[in-house]
Amino acid sequence: MTLKIRSAVKKDFKDVLGLNRSMYAEFHSNPNFGDFVFLKQSSRQRMLKWFNTLLQDVRKDNALYYVAELDGKVVGHCFVRRESPGSELSHVGVFSILVGKDHRKMGVGKKLLDHAIKESRGRFEILHLRVFKQNKIAKALYKSRGFRSFGVAPKFIKRKNSYIDREYMYLLL
């Protein structure tokens, strides 16, 4: 079993859709998972539009998009999207990552993050991300790669009847 990190392509959509849909199921069993979720799961059509727009942003040099592939199946993905192309924020990349539940704690997230950081150098000057304040595992990974916290938005997300604080982190490239 060899893990391969590569650029995302159109044929990855089915696996990416499966990963994103499994994320919705996980929110019910793990209230501290993720950053936020839409109240209603996105349709296949809406997800395809998001996916194609992200691939277009890659072609325009406004995003990087990678998948982690294990035995021919996408088990995780991450992207860095330019904060605001053509503006005074175009040097900032917004990082996002998702690793399938069955492939966590196997180094997939580390490899995706390391690859994204490496490829971001020279394209962006700053990476930033958001994470649930109580997500100690994700925050430890980000801190181990040099990310620093720059603030917390209390009660930023309301999930069912409870609130979750959102933490913001950045990395100077």
Outline where the language-model segments fall.
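A short beta-loop-alpha structural element at the N-terminal edge
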Residues: 4-18
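A short gly/proline-enriched turn/hairpin at secondary-structure junctions
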Residues: 27-41
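Conserved catalytic-core motifs of GNAT/GCN5-like acyltransferases
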Residues: 82, 128-132, 143, 148-165
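Short glycine/proline-centered loop/turn elements that form peptide/ligand docking sites
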Residues: 109, 113, 134-138, 155-160
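Conserved GNAT acetyl-CoA-binding A-motif
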Residues: 120-130
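Terminal substrate-recognition subdomain of acyl/acetyltransferases
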Residues: 163-173
